[in-house]
Amino acid sequence: MLIHPPVSKPCEPPAGIARLAGYLEAQGVSCDLIDANSEGFRFLFGPALRFEEVGSPGRRGMYPAAEGRSERVKAPGETTAERNLTNLDTWTRRAMRNLDRHLRDLRSSPLYSQPDRYRRAIADLGRILACLPYRREVVLGLADYQDGELSPVRSRDLLAAAGHPEKNPFYPYFISGLAPRLAVVAPPLAIGISLNYLSQALCAFAMIGFLRTRHPQTRIVLGGGLVTSWLRRPHARDPFDGLVDNLVAGPGEEFLLNLAKNCGSGIREGGHHSGGGEIWDTMVSRDDNRKPAARSIQAPAYDMTVVHDTTAIHSDLVSHDAPVSRVCWSDNGAASGRAGLADNGPGPGWTGAEARPEVVSSCPDYRAFPGELYLAPGPILPYSAAAGCWWRRCRFCPETAERNPYRPLPAEKVFADLDRLTKEMNPALIHFLDNAMSPALLAALARHPVGVPWYGFARITEQLAAPKFCRRLRDSGCIMLKLGLESGDQRVLDALDKGIDLKTASRVLWSLKAAGIAAYVYLLFGTPAEDREAARRTVEFVAAHSTAIGFLNIALFNLPAFAAAVSGLATRTFSDGDLSLYVDFDHPRGWSRREVRRFLAGEVKRHPAIAAILRRTPPVFTSNHAPFTAMG
């Protein structure tokens, strides 16, 4: 069983566990999938919160505020007596009265062409979540989860969340939604949790604690992007011994397959025998020259080659024969001495990729996720045409620091998958998840339209500066491209090794605008190379191109911990969390975080041209809903 935990945006099915399920099913291994994030939100917004009219409570009703906190909605699953809704404030009563309509409207297209109604719907749902009666230290939103007492970057706090799952807002869902799913069949031999965002961490560990109590013999496997980043930090260790049986860094397909093949009777280490067969915590033996990446984290060595295939979008790359580890698994090439790309990455014209023999690739399986589970005007199909990044030169990029190889799929594989998935899902939108869609992939899509609107992240290149090519992209279904401009100052871009020329960026924005493709532009302020004047040049660039920029994401730079030693900057601990991925630093130009925040609040977000872009950028769901806004 594979589970996607809360909290992340409940607008599209989880691609990670769908990819794993597709691979396992192709190898003859059955696998159940649960999107506990979207199911959890559906439970919180469920029948327990309904009422017929203002002042007339529903069957479960509402109750007024606990002392010291604003009025709250009664938690699903509780048995507190009904209270009159007139005790609630006007906003909450209105939000409750319109709850069904908001949920219905967010699943239909017309709302996305009405910005005021859309913002009201999102704000009202956020109000309801804010008023649910959990601990006052908890702030729950549609895309975020914060706890004033527990930090997602402190392992002891994650263990505390696991020790008291009843304190988590999703605990009623664990009891009434998740537990019955596990009870209908025999307990699974293993449960995999896919943890990708910090907003998921505390809820994921609360869920793990709940599952460990209910199913002590079941093996718990924890993987995903966030876990990979944790394990690939210098001197990484396993802080969850005794709670989590396996930590998986990097792609988990081979690990899970070997686990399924070698699990025997399904006995967890320290558990009780559940039937015949051998104890399955024994490591699969093979002479693979394993070297420790860190204490109790192991990585296999691979025979790597570089393959240049001009007939495909990319070359295949899939690991093979991965052993099962007792504690942690990593496919980290840096630790094992694996051959790979040079540190400076491939050049702009590079078309090849690292490749492994014995290519195995499977189509993701989204059949377990009904479209009505998600807050979107139609099913969204998430799809990865490649793992890693074809550029791999940007300073402070984790793809380079973690030595993630570029692992693309061939053209025929991409189009075969998309053809199959569009027939199965009838999607309203395809979301390409690639870190950066390669020029070859974009060209292939321009030549072979997939018949469904699509969007994704792309680098600013000469290819996108060509008006004719952009028109072909639009004709192929491209609705929006996300562009990491980062800065409007050429010196800053060069210092970051972005490979972006501002003159080219200008032509790209105008070409996309002329073709009818929305540009979702990402800006990053406070980098070590930036000062106030450089930041002002960014503001000037954005203002000058404001009519060509559809949406904006404005972020404050954080220095990754992996870059601290080589940055040449004076650094200090960003937080006391042992799992923190960032450090604080003394800005070499005196451009402190406090000054940057003031600049963003005063000169950036209040600039009339930029403020207009921010107003049309969807709140909370941001780039996930922006394509629907762009389609009008």
Task: State the predicted function of each range.
Residues 236-258, 476-479, 537-559:
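Structural recognition of alpha->loop->beta junctions
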